[in-house]
Amino acid sequence: MLTNQLNSESKNINKIGSIEEQVVSLTQRVKFISNHLKINKKDYSSQRGLRKILGKRKRLLTYLYKKDFLKYKFVIQSLGIRSLK
């Protein structure tokens, strides 16, 4: 799917710990925790963890926006994330 496309392209260009890989990983965790919270609405520790993950992903995307705008746009469009600015 989209993550496989990102993974294959980023492995050819960058290392596994690249910003793009981290954003993909965090996005997968966000989706998983969001689904968990739909079932368990009062799981406040998961809500707090989700906010922390979203903050980290936002910081990474801000860094990517400043460093390489074309990669930023590609990641945003591939993952279906709203743009920061």
Curated annotation (Swiss-Prot):
**Compartment annotation:** Plastid, Chloroplast
Q: Any idea which GO molecular function terms this record carries? A: structural constituent of ribosome
Q: Which residues form the signal peptide?
A: none
GO biological processes:
translation
**PROSITE patterns in the cross-refs:** RIBOSOMAL_S15
Q: Which family does it belong to?
A: Belongs to the universal ribosomal protein uS15 family.
> Which HAMAP family does the UniProt record give?
Ribosomal_uS15_B (MF_01343_B)
Record-given protein name: Small ribosomal subunit protein uS15c
Organism in which the protein naturally occurs: Chaetosphaeridium globosum (Charophycean green alga)
- Gene from which the chain derives: rps15
